[in-house]
């Protein structure tokens, strides 16, 4: 190897210059971005920058591999077979790289990148040699690449030529030789001619030949023709098939359910033959049934009590039985004694219905207003079932078309008579128990969107064990608090809330105010004071506190004042009322008499 020889690395195409070094070989290749070549790689000499015309040879020490190669005798070659020349390397023009000055790094580098180093070697200078600058400044072609050297001579002349201008292969002394990376020569392939079915593919001839007629594929006979393939079902067809299968399954299930229902259903009764009438007659009022529906609105006229059944095979007798569920035959009622009470819309009498004691409420008038109230009360009572609300049993009409409402009988009378005219006074434990029953019934109604609007002591009935139940829901109505509406002034003025008397919009707070007036009756055992419009029907709390007995629990009287506040938003809800009364009731000692809890 000569110093200053320009070489190319075969594997990467990088251009470098051989320079003198202090390593084992005595020289190294400077590629600009790195020094020395990769291990087990080969370089190609492409230009010698030193003029050897005077016959002077470089005194650069040769690598050990090259010395061993010179000492060994040349291999014996056959005289009959001349040496084959080397194939030229494909004309690939390497891209010139800008040399960079850096310290020697004998280790391998991949990708032509370097790492910054701070310590420089003290063996020799880190500046590039003169030969490197001559190679980097040598002129190139128009594209800026170096000119390619002439083709290398045959291998026989490699041993005689020592100037480094021919191709030299330098191998690492410690590693075996690497096979040549030259791409193999490929002969141009010729396109194959497409052949018809059942005919082997034959390549075209290279020699020129006269044009031959095109090959014709043999027509298959009917016996040789393959059977037609079934069309692959498309996704839409699969979906349609699945839908059809699902529909068939649903139809089968429906048929099975119908068969089971027919087996379980008893045979229909034959309708009783009715005598034919020549002319239609109008129904008698006593035979008209009061409509009771599950809707919130009022029904006028003589509509059906129950909606039509979805079954088409339902008998007439079954439908008539369903319609008569809330209608009681007047002949089944038996009145006992005189009236036991009266109200604004009717009087109450004691009676028996099929041997059961009941309360029969007879309405005074039978007009449109009464009809609306009856329908409203029946609609509400029919859907309400609560231990602290009087149970509704049905409705009946007599021959005079008088409406009678039948409910359960409460043998203790109403709360007003027990407080004002009662012979046996109520203990504070019983008063709190009655107040708790009233609050529970009102809480139940409000949870279902129902206002009573006429809560007073006359509409609270007692049993013999001093338990209270709420009755007379004729003025109750369904409400929706989100709708700010003005309602008509109804109820009794002493127990009515100020917003109802002033014809303002109201909500559940009106029942809380009426409950507070009932607490005034329970605490004082007197009729509440009248409220006047000049004071905007406001409750006089100081006057009430003067009438409170000393035995009354303080929290009980305070709850009464809170429930009767003028501002509806300041009144407590029935949930809080229940908690307060329950705490007061638990704090009191038990009565000496029998505990009816």
Curated annotation (Swiss-Prot):
Q: Which reaction does it catalyse?
A: L-seryl-[protein] + ATP = O-phospho-L-seryl-[protein] + ADP + H(+); L-threonyl-[protein] + ATP = O-phospho-L-threonyl-[protein] + ADP + H(+)
Q: Which domain of life is it from?
A: Eukaryota
Q: Which residues form the Protein kinase domain?
A: 334-585
Q: What is its EC number?
A: 2.7.11.1
The UniProt regions of compositional bias labelled Low complexity, in chain numbering, are 157-168, 235-264, 275-301
Q: Specify whether Thylakoid is a keyword of the entry.
A: no
Q: Where is the composition biased (Pro residues)?
A: 72-97, 208-234, 265-274
Would the keyword Kinase be found if you checked this record's keyword annotation? yes
Enumerate the residue ranges of region (Disordered): 49-320
Q: Polar residues bias located where?
A: 49-61, 114-140
Record InterPro entries: Actin_reg-Ser/Thr_kinase (IPR050940), Kinase-like_dom_sf (IPR011009), Prot_kinase_dom (IPR000719), Protein_kinase_ATP_BS (IPR017441), Ser-Thr/Tyr_kinase_cat_dom (IPR001245), Ser/Thr_kinase_AS (IPR008271)
Q: Which UniProt keywords apply?
A: ATP-binding, Kinase, Nucleotide-binding, Serine/threonine-protein kinase, Transferase
Locate the residues binding ATP. 340-348, 361
Q: Which GO terms describe its molecular function?
A: ATP binding; protein kinase activity; protein serine kinase activity; protein serine/threonine kinase activity
Question: Which positions are catalytic residues?
Answer: 454
Q: Which GO terms describe its cellular component?
A: cytoplasm
Query: What family is it from?
Result: Belongs to the protein kinase superfamily. TKL Ser/Thr protein kinase family.
Q: What is this protein called?
A: Probable serine/threonine-protein kinase DDB_G0281745
